[in-house]
Amino acid sequence: MKKEHKSLIRKDGFQTLLASLVCVLGGLIVGYLVLLIIEPSGAFEAIVAVMKSFLRFPGALKLKYFGQALVRTAPLLLCALSVLFAYKVGMFNIGAAGQYCAGACAALYAALAWNMPWYVCILLGMLAGALLGMLAGALRTLFNVNVVISGIMLNWITLYLTNLVLGTVKNPTSPYTKTLQSTTPGALIPSLGLEKLFNNEKSVTIAIPIAVLTAVLVWVVLNKTKFGYELKATGSNYNAAKYCGMKENQNIILTMVIAGALAGFGAGLLYLTGIEDWETTISSVPAMGFNGIAVAFLGGLSPIGSILSAFFIQYITTGGGNVDLQVYCSQISSLISALIIYLCAFVGFFKYFIQTRLRKADERKAAKAAQIQEGGEDK
């Protein structure tokens, strides 16, 4: 028999891509409308500045800011992997932000207080995130506590515990932790010459390829292993997985452990590059964990798709800082970036809309064919 080929619009990957592009365009349009309402005269220039991001700078500076964007893309990608990994088993890991805090706490404290090498600091950061993920998973399986509720509560608890712990290793003259470059340079992730590709930007390290390789590894685990199949089966139908003999509660806890470890890993990949220090007086949970949710959905809940979506989200976030502050207030860059980022989380909705339209078109086509056939039989 001749193999029937699907049209491009009916392929799942193309539908995800199309839905993602619609979300991105929608976010830019909404952002532009907000700028028009606030100050019409500078709206067009502002949205162009956001879209150009670091590309607006001349050659040498462009490479420098490109490198910094990649450095911040790495932890964003890991947070997205944390969210999508948990989502495969039916868990919405909103606690990725708290797990990220735990990872930052353990990694920085090990570096500044114990003078540990970078790889030990990263492992401790992963362990801290994993323990927090395990707690959320255990609450879900043992006491049926929704992971969204426990995740939100643990986010704030972890934030303030992190502030307390890292307050012991902060700079005496500022609210920030001591800089790794001047105190424990051995805790910095090595660059292996990668910084030369980005105008000697010192924060560019092997964290970038490590994050990409981690995404590939997660894809392999989810799609090419028995464990990944069991996770997706548990997420699709909890009772059916239980009936088939799968250890559904064990899978949920293990999934949350891995998700927490990924978020903690992301924190280590950011702070151990030395690109920024932890502010011990911060009163809001870092946005990195929440942005990971948008990245995961924009990437179609695919580890490979999340690589591209993580870079795009960071690209837009960087571009938000280019808005003219003489025309708009200082918060406008964060507002525009947030609008675009969170509208990107509607990929699933637009994908469902596309599939619904295609299904209705098929039903109309089938009904028309049936009418023609009935007419032929009557004759």
Q: Whereabouts are the PLM-identified features?
A:
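Cytosolic-side transmembrane-helix boundaries in multi-pass membrane proteins
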Residues: 1-26, 236, 243-250, 320-379
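Loop-to-transmembrane alpha-helix initiation sites
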Residues: 147-149, 203-210, 252, 284-288, ...
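Helix-loop-helix "hairpin" substructures at the membrane interface of multi-pass membrane proteins
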Residues: 198-278, 303-304
